[in-house]
Amino acid sequence: MYGLEKLGINNVTAAHYNLSPAQLVEKALANNEGILSDTGAFVISTGKYTGRAPDDKFFVDTPEVHKYIDWSRNQPIEKEKFDAIFGKLVAYLQNREIFIFDGRAGANPEYTRRFRVINELASQNLFIHQLLIRTDEEYNENNDIDFTIISAPNFHCVPEIDGVNSEAAIIINFEKKIAIICATKYSGEIKKSVFSIMNYIMPHENILPMHCSANMDPVTHETAIFFGLSGTGKTTLSADPNRKLIGDDEHGWCDKGIFNFEGGCYAKCINLKEESEPEIYRAIKFGSLVENVVVDPITRKIQYEDASITPNTRVGYPIDYIPNAELSGVGGIPKVVIFLTADSFGVLPPISRLSQEAAMYHFVTGFTAKLAGTELGVKEPVPTFSTCFGEPFMPMDPSVYAEMLGERLKKHNTKVYLINTGWSGGAYGTGKRINLKYTRAMVTAVLNGYFDNAEYKHDDIFNLDIPQSCPGVPSEIMNPIDTWQDRDKYIIAAKKLANLFYNNFKEKYPNMPENITNAGPKYND
């Protein structure tokens, strides 16, 4: 039944296949998995795990994949250990109700992959139903499934026996084309497992997988992509009422253009307001899954400003909940690439122009601050360097992805900008987060070509070119030193961050070509 016997899953009490969102909400309510908000969205608590658990993620080390995976950044697990855990997981699923969703990753039909996701929770099946690309196909046992993911939040590993680090484990086995997710209800683990799998598969077909959002001009069809780690603004900035949204997080870049890996969005909703983010706010309705928000027990209104459970409150919804979405999920060659960073030091400019060499430097550097709640244990912003703006999800050597991006930027003469959505006027705790209104104005100016002929000032500490004006943005915030009350303290903080850049690059990329190395900050005494 639904290929379960091939996996060794037998004697389930019920197997529900490709239920509709309404059916899944009914099941989840009946199973006490969550509640409905006043807008009809389904609200759940994910318990202990309110963010990803990167220390609990593993790849099965087999001869077939060993040479392709960068083991300096990814944890291996023995095939025998995986088999033992999988055997116990399969036994655990006996006499349980399970939910199955068949969908696709990759909107370009030439490169699409079929995924089967098996859940013990109806709410998690609702999430992945809304996040992957949905098909109208009925079940056909002859349809090949490219990868199967099994998520069982109530199944716990035993670290001492299973060779993992905690009761939770996210294990991807490329040889068997199976991934398992144990002991965590955080739905993002399913989504990011799909992404990690695609990030391994796609480069073998000369497709650059990217941790980015993308949108498109509805008239010219020119596309822009926004790279960035969690919380830097990918989803927010790509949801632009004047442009068509292609996708908010995961894309591939092939010879003909870009394509979304997904069929939905997964947005942060802490401090969400309709005035500043209307598209996301209005997407929180029936069929959406909301995680870890506080809900008024009487009115059932979501208290978006309340971070008492976690700052990493999230909502998953299908992309057609965004009114101006490009439902094909496909766009042309990007005209503009924007790197988003959330600088908690408060010293990077709000926007700077990058040469192709500087673009390569900042792509492999991937600087940002991990924002509170996005990973287990992160309570306040932590400066981090995440290769390709997505190191936790990139199984292969970073040079693979960097070279592919470099080739494409050069071939298409794509313009690249670095935008800081983090702090201004001081570091985290003293400065303020850059106003979203100003960041949107800068993005609009980039897309309109305003900065092509703007006046620039070179920043010697960070080796960046800073435009001196932008429509809709106060000129005094363009140069970060002007936003600090104490300029000497700014210089000390800026040099500290520049040295972090320098030391990170020197340690990670000693063999990088000199022209790329020289495009970054120099060491400051």
Swiss-Prot record:
This is Phosphoenolpyruvate carboxykinase (ATP). Its cofactor is Mn(2+). Mn(2+) binds at residues 192, 211, 249. ATP binds at residues 192, 211, 228-236, 277, 314, 433-434, 439. PROSITE patterns: PEPCK_ATP. It is found in: Cytoplasm. It catalyses: oxaloacetate + ATP = phosphoenolpyruvate + ADP + CO2. Involved in the gluconeogenesis. Catalyzes the conversion of oxaloacetate (OAA) to phosphoenolpyruvate (PEP) through direct phosphoryl transfer between the nucleoside triphosphate and OAA. Its main location: cytoplasm. The lineage of its organism: Bacteria, Fusobacteriati, Fusobacteriota, Fusobacteriia, Fusobacteriales. Belongs to the phosphoenolpyruvate carboxykinase (ATP) family. Keywords: ATP-binding, Cytoplasm, Decarboxylase, Gluconeogenesis, Lyase, Manganese, Metal-binding, Nucleotide-binding. Substrate binds at residues 52, 186, 192, 314. Pfam families: PEPCK_ATP. PANTHER family: PHOSPHOENOLPYRUVATE CARBOXYKINASE (ATP) (PTHR30031:SF0), PHOSPHOENOLPYRUVATE CARBOXYKINASE ATP (PTHR30031). One of its GO terms (cellular component) is cytosol. It comes from the Bacteria. The keyword NAD does not apply. Gene3D superfamilies: 3.90.228.20, Phosphoenolpyruvate Carboxykinase, domain 1 (3.40.449.10), Phosphoenolpyruvate Carboxykinase, domain 2 (2.170.8.10). It comes from Fusobacterium nucleatum subsp. nucleatum (strain ATCC 25586 / DSM 15643 / BCRC 10681 / CIP 101130 / JCM 8532 / KCTC 2640 / LMG 13131 / VPI 4355).
